[in-house]
């Protein structure tokens, strides 16, 4: 994402590029980034580097997250990136990843409630934040980085129709992994008392929102800032799990690139909502990249 600073803390996007590369494909089993996955990432980053040079970018920051944190050859991958594209990427810790995602989507947490839950579902990990509203904005009280993202869960569930029992087991596993965070802060009691708003930033929640709105093709302007209630999450997650790969791929809000991963993302969303059943969920088509841009605009 390439942007120009406007007045105040705002920015205007002037160029961007996004491609699914599945860098963590096979990582859970092998402990290493696969050569083919690195090749896909390098090809995408070469496009990014070309855009950066063309636009004469004055300030740049590129980050790597869970796949490079976990892989024994993560440093080798980053060295290749620098040698072949000229881009210097830094591996960031889960806490910084969580904070950057929050910075990018916090403006949408606007219901005036005292507590918040934010989650960011990625390919290799899922960050879940427990937040407190303060005079200056939202403060991260605690968080957990689950070593589960859509790539690893998709490898477990497979690309075709997902059996009800397998899907339910994935949802239960995710909900269970959030138990310690819940217990540390009594989050469930705050949710039951109606004192918590929730926001999700990921391709999964935006896809579910697009489907819920009946969009034939994805429309960021309509999806970003929209709402999903739990009944919608459950209904459309079940429909996606019951569909085969081709059925998912034909939907304009899913497409062939994500057809084998979207059910894994649905399981993550449902697991979080099973642990904390808020009345509705805010949808953000923004997050980590926007958080990085805001940091660059603030300067060192």
Please provide the spans of the model-predicted regions.
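A generic, well-ordered mixed alpha/beta core segment in the N-terminal half of proteins
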Residues: 115-125, 129
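Helical "lid/coupling" subdomains associated with nucleotide-phosphate turnover
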Residues: 22, 26-55, 67-115, 132-133, ...
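N-terminal basic/disordered segments at the start of proteins
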Residues: 1-11
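Cationic, histidine-enriched alpha-helical/coil surfaces that engage anionic ligands
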Residues: 59
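Short beta-strand-to-turn element immediately C-terminal to the catalytic PLP-Schiff-base lysine
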Residues: 2-4, 129-132
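N-terminal glycine-rich anion-binding loops that anchor highly charged ligand groups
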Residues: 9-25
